[in-house]
Each structure stands twice: as structure tokens, then as C-alpha cells.
Amino acid sequence: FASTLSEKDISSSEKISEAMEGFEVADLMELQPRDVVALYNLLNNNLPLIINVNRASDILKLIDIKKLYGLNLILMSAQEAELVKNEIAENKIPVIINPFDNIPDSFDELASNIRISASLEEVGIKVMFSESRTHNYHLIRQGAGNAVANGMSYTGAIMALTSNVAKSFNITDRGILKKGMKAD
């Protein structure tokens, strides 16, 4: 539905409501105008869709969905990404991982291991680091060190904290270590 809309269709809540009339999916999903704008931007403005996924079979399904809809997909967590790393690399999908995750928390993460960042880096996947959203977020730097201790290159770990993030989210004024850029 959102892929059939134009800029004019999403210019106001009234226009969105008019455009939604007759679309059963919009009614079934109880979409609000703000939801339609978000979907429109996702499909038409190349905004990244971040999906928290762990199981290798689910990652492969998401790759199919990415191809079908032309989505700018980013995988989050992706503890079994190592099992399908070639497919992820082939489709140029960045991955956000927690470098401290090294054992399975569920049956969706049975292939979880401490070397995942190094393994993904080896096949050219843009790796980014994240940490559990707690007061310990500052430990992300230590996580980068753990990734290096377990096979990731120093350069890859720095890029996982800086330029890979900037490139994956189309941020042009920061995140790259270069003269004239903001260094946060």
C-alpha cells in the first residue's frame, strides 16, 4: 500500500486518510496516518529498516523480503549470522551485534559465539556494535576490544564504532575520522 503513494498523498493527515480508504490491509492493521508516512519513507526514501533477528532461517527469509521490496535492511543481534554470512555479504546487509554476546540465550541463538564479529568482517560485512540499553552503554568500547581479542581487526573494530555506522545510516557529517568532520 505505502509503495503506491506519492509525496502528494502523504502531505497531510487528511490526504493520507483519503488514500487509505478502500485498502483492507490498512484497516486490518489499524494503520494510522503516521504509520503510513513511516512505511512510505521506508519504501521510497531508502531509510534503513532495522530488524532484531537471530535464527539463520529467519535471516534468509528477511533477505528474500529485502530483495522483494528493495528495502535498506540492517540486521540487529543476528547471533546465527555466521551460518549465512555469505548470503548476507552478497546482499550487502550491515549487521549490528553485541560483541559481548557469546553464548545462546534461546534456541534462536544456538550458533552464537564470541568470534561472530571477526567472521562477518572476513567476508566483507559492515559490522556495527551495540550494547544492551542500560547504564553500561559506555562498555561498547570494551566490546570492541573483545572483538579484536577474538579475531576482528583493529581497523574493523574502529569502523564498527564509527564509519560503518555513518555509512549504514547515511550520516554524512559525522562518524568518519577525517579532517573537518565531527569526531563523535
Task: List the predicted regions and their residue ranges.
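Short acidic active-site motifs
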Residues: 38, 83-84, 116
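His/Asp/Glu-enriched, well-ordered alpha-helical/loop segment
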Residues: 48, 89, 98-102, 106-184
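Active-site-adjacent beta->alpha loops and helix N-cap segments on the catalytic face
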Residues: 80-90
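Catalytic beta/alpha-barrel core
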Residues: 50-54, 72-80, 100-106
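Polyanionic/metal-chelating signatures
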Residues: 1-73
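Amphipathic coiled-coil/heptad-repeat helices and related helical stalk/stem segments
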Residues: 35, 55-58, 81, 112-113, ...
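Glycine-enriched alpha-helix->loop->beta-strand junction motifs that scaffold or abut catalytic
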Residues: 66-73, 89-96, 124-126
